[in-house]
């Protein structure tokens, strides 16, 4: 059985820089129903050879039974779990697999699926490597775990709204794309390889705007970006990027539904009082008077509210002379503290 994702959604999952799997725990032996390309590259197993099988084929002689039982217990209890387990690739080579798993409920609110995200921690079995492994685990937890947890959370929300993980994931692929761009920006900034975990926000938001404008596909609708220079922690950038993705997409979907051309302005400005203001302004039809977005609405509205709350930000919607203006005020004082903490750790 294969998970029912549209082809462009499979491409979005496939481009992720980490291994992702989905298992259906309602079926006998809890088989995998989807794996992405990063999983194939990490393990050496092809998708066709593993879909329909329980993931125990990754286990071997030196796999800790205790780790296996902890994972099994989490599945039985429908709980999130994080574990580092010794697994084996298709060619028999062993490696440490840092695994994060989270449950998904079906439309009847029954625990049916488990999403697994895996990070290859290397091959060494030596006890002398414990300190180095601990350091790498800390890096994974700090840089990656929060973003992977956000993906699991978004899949959970999307599946509950769409009637199960086999439904269409048109919006989800865009949300994953925003995180994929973050990882690319980390590489450009050196944050994925060095100790610095800070990235320039403006460049990241510019890439998100370009990607969303491209996905929209209407050449006569322009997205202009103007961004002050500001560095933020990677975790913060991820949240802001997802938030901007939601607001931009909302503008493109609704502001120009009755016309073929228009302009959306994306600005990020450092304000007095140690605040960052992110503005999305369009010259479209304007938000209806009876619409209380994002306090009411669809899945995107719910995600916007959660991201705003997580950033400790304030969001205000203004109906302009033409179009709509969305201002998001994010406290920079907290972000500066996080940056200072990161550099102190380094």
Swiss-Prot record:
Alphabetical list of PROSITE patterns matching this protein: HIS_KIN, PAC, PAS
Domain PAC: 79-133
Modified residues (S-4a-FMN cysteine): 55
Keywords: ATP-binding, Chromophore, Flavoprotein, FMN, Kinase, Nucleotide-binding, Phosphoprotein, Photoreceptor protein, Receptor, Sensory transduction, Transferase, Virulence
Phosphohistidine PTM positions: 142
Molecular functions (GO terms): ATP binding; photoreceptor activity; protein histidine kinase activity
InterPro entries: HATPase_C_sf, His_kinase_dom, PAS, PAS-assoc_C, PAS-like_dom_sf, Sig_transdc_His_kin-like_C, Sig_transdc_His_kin_sub2_dim/P
PTM: FMN binds covalently to cysteine after exposure to blue light and this bond is spontaneously broken in the dark.
Domain Histidine kinase: 139-334
Reactions the enzyme catalyzes: ATP + protein L-histidine = ADP + protein N-phospho-L-histidine
EC number: 2.7.13.3
Domain PAS stretches: 8-82
Function: Photosensitive kinase that is involved in increased bacterial virulence upon exposure to light.
Protein name: Blue-light-activated histidine kinase 2
Organism in which the protein naturally occurs: Erythrobacter litoralis (strain HTCC2594)
